Amino acid sequence: MGKNKLLHPSLVLLLLVLLPTDASVSGKPQYMVLVPSLLHTEAAEKGCVLLSYLNETVTVSASLESVRGNRSLFTDLEAENDVLHCVAFAIPKSSSNEEVMFLTVQVKGPTQEFKKRTTVMVKNEDSLVFVQTDKSIYKPAQTVKFRVVSMDENFHPLNELIPLVYIQDPKGNRIAQWQSFQLEGGLKQFSFPLSSEPFQGSYKVVVQKKSGRRTEHPFTVEEFVLPKFEVQVTVPKIITILEEEMNVSVCGLYTYGKPVPGHVTVSICRKYSDASNCHGEDSQAFCEKFSGQLNSHGCFYQQVKTKVFQLKRKEYEMKLHTKAQIQEEGTVVELTGRQSSEITRTITKLSFVKADSHFRQGIPFFGQVRLVDGKGVPIPNKVIFIRGNEANYYSNATTDEHGLVQFSINTTNVMGTSLTVRVKYKDRSPCYGYQWVSEEHEEAHHTAYLVFSPSKSFVHLEPVSHELPCGQTQTVQAHYILNGGALQGLKKLSFYYLIMAKGGIVRTGTHGLLVKQEDMKGHFSISIPVKSDIAPVARLLIYAVLPTGDVIGDSAKYDVENCLANKVDLSFSPSQSLPALHAHLRVTAAPQSLCALRAVDQSVLLMKPDAELSASSVYNLLPEKDLTGFPGPLNDQGDEDCINRHNVYINGITYTPVSSTNEKDMYSFLEDMGLKAFTNSKIRKPKLCPQLQQYEMHGPEGLRVGFYESDVMGRGHARLVHAEEPPTETVRKYFPETWIWDLVVVNSSGVAEVGVTVPDTITEWKAGAFCLSEDAGLGISSTASLRAFQPFFVELTMPYSVIRGEVFTLKATVLNYLPKCIRVSVQLEASPAFLAVPVEKEQAPHCICANGRQTVSWAITPKSLGNVNFTVSAEALESQELCGTEVASVPEYGKKDTVIKPLLVEPEGLEKETTFNSLLCPSGGEVSEELSLKLPPNVVEESARASVSVLGDILGSAMQNTQNLLQMPYGCGEQNMVLFAPNIYVLDYLNETQQLTPEIKSKAIGYLNTGYQRQLNYKHYDGSYSTFGERYGRNQGNTWLTAFVLKTFAQARAYIFIDEAHITQALIWLSQRQKDNGCFRSSGSLLNNAIKGGVEDEVTLSAYITIALLEIPLTVTHPVVRNALFCLESAWKTAQEGDHGSHVYTKALLAYAFALAGNQDKRKEVLQSLHEEAVKKDNSVHWERPQKPKAPVGHFYEPQAPSAEVEMTSYALLAYLTAQPAPTSEDLTSATNIVKWITKQQNAQGGFSSTQDTVVALHALSKYGAATFTRTGKAAQVTIQSSGTFSNKFQVDNNNRLLLQQVSLPELPGEYSMKVTGEGCVYLQTSLKYNILPEKEEFPFALGVQTLPQTCDEPKAHTSFQISLSVSYTGSRSASNMAIVDVKMVSGFIPLKPTVKMLERSNHVSRTEVSNNHVLIYLDKVSNQTLSLFFTVLQDVPVRDLKPAIVKVYDYYETDEFAIAEYNAPCSKDLGNA
């Protein structure tokens, strides 16, 4: 049976009839069991059984065999004779995701037995998972909201356990993750805040399923401004080389649907082909440019001659690129739209719309062709020529109004195994030459192959060319020819049909046909209701079993609309609304559906269109949309004997067998369906025995199998294939990008009404919903729109900030989109905070007609400081006066619009801040402290303000300000850590003292997440970190910063997700920098010179890294730690033996390192040495550097201690507190004295002067707070009293010890006393702020500022000028640490960002930032060599009587070292008149 299975590929078989005489026994029992070749575990699978011509009862059984054992699918199934019976079965989950198994089917009866075994593919059923984000694009610091949804293959919700979801940034870093969560109702919602400085680019949400398979969903993070309007460019999609003109239209539409007034510039270009090697003038693009004004509809139209593009010329792209730029009238806003047109040489094209893939001799071959032009437009009334040589068919026909021609070919006389039909309209035109493109008239041809049937009986399904629409019934015609001799006395022949979809059998049916004992020909119809169960591709199989044992059949494929059973509808009521009104969102779906809603501003979709959730995108999740063919391992070679190559004589007719691989038999129809057949019926055409000796030159013996597999693979390889009264006035201030992101459950009637408040944005909101139901599955709504609109509204234009006394112009622009003219009064509400003078003398109401706008202006002189609100109202008035030729109308609703916008008014001069801190512990008695608040003589009037804060916890102030600990920028990798690390110490402290609340925890974890993201910006490919990261050209990792990040990331793991790869990579990088003596080599620059101690650099750095490793924590036996401790012990021994000792900073680090390592002896030795060098003053202890810089002269108050001294004192404090097993009472006494000094150095936010001192000091204070924490039942009373009339009392107890209690101090200057009674300790902090006018004094920096031009003579000086800076260091050191140049903008001007960014090309500029009205320039250091810096500023809003702006340069780590200078705009006195 197994011999002669290979046919040689060069053989061609034409078999007219092949019917072995011993197979024609009348009424022989026939069995057929059909099972899909691909089965899924844990899914409802189905197999179908047909028993024919049986006179006894039989049972059918099926079992699966694998290497892990056998499993029965069904046993002893009794099936009726001549009834197609389908049985459902399920396969348990396998340990292998995909496996080939043996399927055995056995039919058994008293006299009959049939058994067959074949292979099937078994795959584990996997859920369908998708992710939906609220938007496709986000700005830095926005929150990403997303949903994870899981369904089965029928789109019903699955409440599965998802092992892992994470977010990955553009560099592949995993920045957030969620583990092991259960879906509810088939979904779960998440949110994640982006940092203020994330990597920009493509991110993705990754869902990892239990199967290990992953689903990914991309989104983009960019800095962007939402477009106000859309530029719509309309050009022909296709133009032919014969066209002489093309029409172009450009329209500008605001997101609220109104036309844009403005000017348009259009360019159309045909570019030179990239593939050509020609350059120079000949390779220039052919372009046409034109411009014009947009009309009243916001559109511009132009007819363009195509001659300029030389459409017939080669070497140029066969495409025209159209670019249109619209500049909005009255603003500098310019947006661009693009479209392209394909150039085609095809003038006409013929294509088969409907044609059979195979033909049956005697049944007409049906076909339909369409004639279209080069643009795809049907051409009617044209004669086309049809030819079918094998059938001697030659015809012509005229196309109908749709360009269609239908034809049928009589196949009775076709003697070959193929039929080729060729269709032609015109012959190809003569060639123009090698430089020119010739026109083309495309012909069409189609080849159909013979269907094999030994009985000469056939059934044929008529093709359907269109997609089957949901909710309708499709009728399919079945044509048949029956050979009377093959019926053998049969009176009724049953045709059985089944439909497969999504890889499984979904429907079956039977059609009975009364037959006569003669040849029969006819047709009947099959009705198919189109529902979601047969989408997206339905395959229909029809077959009949003849008494001879022959099976006749056909299969057809139908594309089905992507139907979803859950019909979801979404609508807004009303569909247009004024801002801030209530509206209703109505959702209808299957009862009890869980519906996920989303509504976003259309501007977001214009910025980056969404990959919208749709029925099509959901169907694309299916692993098998259409099962066809068999995967390679499942190919059945058949077990029939081959026949020899000689003539066969049957019934007086001679047949010559010839091999043909394209000839169709019943087996191939089943294969098309992806069905395995277990049968004793004849379903295969006979195989011809090979004659290899005659064909050796044609190829290897096994080529037949190879061809078969590739053919199957090519065909699919199991292919995946009630409304309120609106107000008369609106006040607008809420402008979100995502408006609605909610989950709702519809009621038992299938309806949910959601009340919403329309945001203040004047735009169109686009909403969508998807719903999940246990019964009906998934449904997706079409987009619903709500237009938030006002008949008219007012917009304000003002600068970000001004200085008190400056005059600026406040502009209010009123826009009217009513169909009629209105008379509008525009009023600015008076306020004592400013003086307003109308620019126009006449303040009478303004007449604004349809689609018009009017601007009203005031000259404003601010009088008060701080945020000053400007309230402008525009009201439509009732009036009988004419507006033009008509009486002004008044809108029924929204006749008054009010906009409130704040403006920051700043005092003149330079702001100074002084903080006074006290830790008062009454211990049952009373303690008091006097406070004298004085002001310097050069203080700016009214600029002084002071407040006192009362907290019951030493870390209270820092807890309130964890993201604002320093009043300085956070633009580098080290500075970012001050936003990150303190949150860990706060959480540890509150956890240990049992004070952690969910609110504080949530807030701190949020900060940790954003800090983590931001820090990854500074990571290098090798796992190290540097101050500005690789993107700022710093190619070398920084040893010190890498150790800092490593220990902090390791400590943060207790609270947030940190990718272990970051920790491992950093640790490896650091270990590679360890020398043989255990010390570490320095890599990268240290921006703080204070920790550079000459020869001790290596010891200091090694001590710092050892501390970091022990804080991870690594054990002292870890090889890297063990060697590092050897380095430190050796260094301490050398220092003890030497004359000069060790730097105080290094000693403090050594003391803490030995404490962490548990080396108490060494800890005591170093602390004793430190104690001898300590500065003891006012019951406090601290340490100073030996070469401490002199404090600047002329300070009104004593400045904060330098960063390095706070840092080394904090390390000493940590060493006292890290005694093992616990600090002694002597340690705590020493620690308390240190804490008194450290707390005195805190700034108003709870931080210190710079980055490292803040991080280390807060770490030390948190350890001290935890070591000394006591929970007392008694309260402390705090009284703050002035020498005048002011008095205020606070109470601090266990319930409010973390509460920041604050009061302003009204008397300045003034004398105050602060008294505390009761129990516990109270932390008091007084903050005094004032402005002073800069005076000439000696600074450690030389700072010069000039403007170019310097005078107002040049015409552009009113609107633009350059700021030129010169900076050098003149202090006591050779160079400064990292320095910041802070340039404040003069009022009404903004920096030109590209010119600021250009500064980063300088070797000395590490980074630049534009923050509100300041430009920040980071310098890695400043020496005595002068640095020159330039950038440009532009006028944003005219301001008169401009005050000078301040430029300040300061050392980031020695903040007392600074210099200030002033500059003014060249036209500072008359800018308001510009």
UniProtKB/Swiss-Prot annotation:
Glycosylation sites per record: 55, 70, 247, 396, 410, 869, 991, 1424
Cellular location(s): Secreted
Gene3D superfamilies for this protein: 1.50.10.20, 2.20.130.20, 2.60.120.1540, 2.60.40.1930, 2.60.40.1940, Alpha-macroglobulin, receptor-binding domain, Immunoglobulins
Chain intervals for the UniProt region annotation (Inhibitory): 704-709, 719-723, 730-735
MF annotations from Gene Ontology: protease binding; serine-type endopeptidase inhibitor activity
Domain of life the protein comes from: Eukaryota
Subunit details: Homotetramer; disulfide-linked.
Family listed: Belongs to the protease inhibitor I39 (alpha-2-macroglobulin) family.
Name of the protein this chain belongs to: Alpha-2-macroglobulin
Species assigned in the record: Pongo abelii
Lineage, highest ranks first: Eukaryota, Metazoa, Chordata, Craniata, Vertebrata
Gene name of this polypeptide: A2M
